[in-house]
């Protein structure tokens, strides 16, 4: 991934605005430390801060079409780029080996709707010189971050950037650009291009679970995400989701390393034929112990890192600066991920696989055990998936990209979502003694199939859900709460700020994070934040920690 900035129809002289644009783009350089680029056409400027993963030597951006009339700045990876190149009708002269260059010619042949043809994670802005317009698009789920800004001083100017910090100095209104949409400045319309069969949360599927299909679709998703020309690894917490991704990745890495094929998959081999795994936690935390066991089982080159509570607290302001949120759940989980990402990047790794999305797809958060019906269970799953760009995707993207590390999330593959969200929700529910994410566990349980090698140790495969902020060590959350008590007095807590409106923090911890956020960001940035809380209507505690949910408490008795 990278950092992008685009400003269309600049109100002032473009050359006079250029230094300001470059300064704004510089705020994103942590996302792309490898190179900086810009392109100016008429009154439009596109900037790019590059993290080179594919097309390392030739893929500098912005990308320009063979006739010079289309200019593109992209943050993301297009996994089907080779097939898309082959299917182009025209005979185009590609200038790079970048996976993103194909977007230029897809747009030429199909217009803005070409976004629906892309299999990957992406945010991009394209300038069409003939029509003097821009088109912006974001991937279906919002794995990559993208914001759109507006200025009352120049209402005809369109602003786009990967992060808020590149927009708030010049925009007085900012929105999170909706996933699965494209924007066309010619019509000034934002159009939803992503229309999967599962989108209507009131349409309840009735398909029985096909365990083989579920397993093979996830394996295919991991395989395509190994596309890289740089060393990669996996984030391994020792929980079900990250452990499954690590297991599949280890198999695929070994398979590719031993292959003599020149297929698309074979070209993803890096300098490391053995998979590297990375874990973090407080000393002695549940995640570290479980991750170590998984790494031993998979024979990965395992890197275990610890942090102290003081180190986590010291990083908190930086975490809020990079995450651009005050949501309690996101900040709790992002802090160890942020610290781990720094360690990983220092070890020469640029890309990791991560396990985000599984809990939303399969109802893995323990509060789902309170779902009153299959209909309610499914609707909540779909709602959570639709809002991932405001929570876990935001965390996975910004925690890692703070250090120029790219995170890829196989569970959010379009094909996998199509399979998993069309399963009868009753198959996912916590009934008849079933654990959370039962069908996912069952799909990778080889106990009764001697033709398959085990994916994971049984006690890991059937380990109860621990949210990342819990698994790194329960004392981490306790320390955050205790520190908030010291930082926020009872008198201050009783007088929330008027500008917060109805978004009033209900705990001192939430109040503290909002206060820190306001010290860093101007008021308009708060409109992009959504707080993650369990389903109150289901009788769930408001604290998002999994250990406060009934299922976790019952399991400990």
From Swiss-Prot:
* Localization per Swiss-Prot or TrEMBL: Cytoplasm; Nucleus
Q: Which SUPFAM superfamilies match?
A: Adenine nucleotide alpha hydrolases-like, N-terminal nucleophile aminohydrolases (Ntn hydrolases)
The GO molecular function terms of this record are: asparagine synthase (glutamine-hydrolyzing) activity; ATP binding
Positions binding ATP in this chain are 235, 280, 354-355
* Record carries keyword Amino-acid biosynthesis: yes
Phenotype of gene-disrupted mutants: Causes asparagine auxotrophy.
Q: Which residues bind L-glutamine?
A: 50-54, 75-77, 99
**Where is it predominantly found?**
cytoplasm
Residue ranges annotated for the Asparagine synthetase domain, each copy included: 196-531
The reply on keyword Nucleus is yes
Q: List UniProt keywords, sorted A-Z.
A: Amino-acid biosynthesis, Asparagine biosynthesis, ATP-binding, Cytoplasm, Glutamine amidotransferase, Ligase, Nucleotide-binding, Nucleus, Phosphoprotein
Q: Which Gene3D superfamilies match?
A: Glutamine Phosphoribosylpyrophosphate, subunit 1, domain 1, HUPs
Protein's GO biological process:
asparagine biosynthetic process; L-asparagine biosynthetic process
What NCBIfam families would the database entry show? asn_synth_AEB, PRK09431.1
Return the protein name. Probable asparagine synthetase [glutamine-hydrolyzing]
What gene makes this protein?
A: asn1
């Amino acid at each position: 991934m990278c950092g992008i900035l685009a400003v269309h129809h600049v109100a002032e002289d473009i050359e006079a605005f250029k230094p300001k644009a470059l300064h704004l783009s510089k705020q994103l350089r942590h996302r792309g430390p490898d190179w900086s680029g810009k392109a100016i056409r008429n009154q439009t400027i596109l900037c790019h801060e590059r993290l080179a993963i594919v097309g390392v030597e030739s893929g500098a951006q912005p990308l320009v079409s063979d006739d010079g009339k289309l200019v593109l700045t992209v943050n993301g990876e297009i996994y089907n780029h080779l097939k898309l190149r082959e299917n182009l009708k025209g005979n185009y002269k590609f200038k790079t080996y970048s996976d993103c260059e194909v977007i230029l010619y897809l747009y030429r042949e199909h217009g803005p709707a070409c976004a629906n043809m892309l299999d990957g994670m992406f945010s991009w802005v394209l300038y069409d010189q003939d029509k003097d317009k821009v088109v912006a698009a974001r991937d279906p789920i919002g794995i990559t971050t993208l914001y759109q800004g507006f200025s009352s001083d120049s209402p005809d100017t369109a602003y786009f950037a990967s992060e808020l910090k590149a927009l708030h100095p010049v925009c007085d209104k900012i929105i999170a650009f909706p996933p699965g949409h494209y924007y066309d400045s010619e019509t000034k319309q934002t159009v939803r291009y992503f229309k999967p069969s599962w989108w209507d949360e009131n349409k309840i599927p009735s398909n029985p679970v096909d365990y083989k299909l579920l397993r093979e679709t996830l394996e295919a998703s991991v395989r395509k995400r190994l596309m890289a020309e740089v060393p990669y690894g996996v984030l391994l917490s020792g929980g079900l989701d990250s452990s499954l991704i690590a297991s599949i990745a280890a198999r695929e890495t070994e398979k590719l390393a031993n292959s003599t094929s020149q297929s698309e998959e074979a070209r993803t081999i890096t300098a490391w034929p053995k998979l590297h795994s990375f874990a973090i936690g407080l000393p002695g935390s549940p995640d570290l112990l479980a991750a170590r066991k998984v790494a031993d089982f998979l024979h990965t080159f395992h890197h275990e890192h610890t942090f102290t509570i003081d180190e986590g607290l010291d990083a908190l302001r930086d975490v809020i600066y990079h995450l651009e949120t005050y949501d309690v759940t996101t900040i709790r989980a992002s802090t160890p991920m942020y610290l781990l990402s720094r360690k990983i990047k220092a070890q020469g790794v640029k890309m990791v696989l991560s396990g985000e999305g599984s809990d939303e797809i399969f109802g893995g958060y323990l509060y789902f055990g309170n779902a009153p019906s299959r209909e309610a269970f499914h609707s909540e799953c779909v709602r959570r998936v639709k809002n991932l760009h405001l929570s876990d995707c935001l965390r996975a993207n910004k925690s890692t990209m703070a250090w120029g590390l790219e995170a890829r999330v196989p569970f959010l593959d379009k094909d996998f979502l199509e399979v998993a969200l069309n399963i009868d929700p009753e198959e996912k529910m916590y009934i008849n003694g079933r654990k959370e994410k039962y069908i996912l566990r069952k799909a990778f349980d080889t106990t009764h199939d001697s033709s398959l090698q085990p994916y994971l140790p049984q006690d890991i495969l059937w380990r109860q859900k621990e949210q990342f902020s819990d698994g790194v060590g329960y004392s981490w959350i306790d320390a955050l709460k205790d520190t908030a008590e010291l930082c926020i007095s009872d008198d201050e807590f009783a007088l929330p700020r008027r500008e917060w409106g109805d978004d009033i923090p209900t705990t001192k911890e939430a109040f503290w994070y909002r206060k820190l956020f306001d010290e860093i960001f101007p008021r308009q940035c708060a409109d992009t934040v959504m707080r993650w809380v369990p389903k109150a209507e289901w009788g769930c505690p408001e604290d998002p920690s999994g250990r406060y949910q009934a299922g976790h408490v019952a399991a400990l008795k």
